[in-house]
UniProtKB/Swiss-Prot annotation:
PANTHER family: TWO-COMPONENT RESPONSE REGULATOR (PTHR43228), TWO-COMPONENT RESPONSE REGULATOR ARR22 (PTHR43228:SF1). This is Chemotaxis protein CheY. SMART domains: REC (SM00448). Binds 1 Mg(2+) ion per subunit. InterPro entries: CheY-like_superfamily (IPR011006), Sig_transdc_resp-reg_receiver (IPR001789), ST_Response_Regulator (IPR052048). The keyword Cytoplasm applies. One of its GO terms (biological process) is phosphorelay signal transduction system. Its cofactor is Mg(2+). Residues 3-118 form the Response regulatory domain. Mg(2+) binds at D8, D9, D53, T55. The gene is cheY. Disulfide bonds: none annotated. Phosphorylated by CheA.
Length: 119
């Protein structure tokens, strides 16, 4: 089982991802509601993959991505956002994200991104 950290300020989005992965090779080991929590939880649980929302309070996902990548350049992070603007996608990939999922997302797309990042 690969360990997954889910980061989103919306509980229903975290629950949706948990439901999508419940019968897969991914185990949710931690959740966070903002970027500050994400960085802390990343250090605590050392997940294999992180799903990371962009728009969150306290610290946004792009800043959390930068901090995680600075600590662990091999981190596997998948960005999730309702804002699929090309510039934001490019920025996330340049900062080290392995993939970008636009909300609302489909189960197949989430699993595809996770499996791709796991390789």
């Amino acid at each position: 089982m690969l360990k997954l950290l889910i980061v989103d300020d919306a509980m229903f989005m975290r629950t949706m991802i948990k439901n999508i992965v419940k019968d897969s090779d991914f185990e949710v080991v931690a959740e966070a509601e903002n970027g500050l929590e994400a960085v802390k939880k990343y250090d605590e649980v050392k997940p294999d993959i992180v799903t990371l929302d962009i728009t969150m309070p306290e610290m946004d996902g792009l800043e959390a991505l930068a901090q995680i990548m600075a600590k662990d350049p091999s981190a596997k992070v998948i960005m999730c956002s309702a804002m699929g603007q090309q510039g934001m996608v490019v920025d996330a990939i340049k900062k080290g994200a392995k993939d970008f999922i636009v909300k609302p997302f489909q189960a197949d797309r989430v699993l595809e991104a996770l499996e791709k990042a796991a390789k």
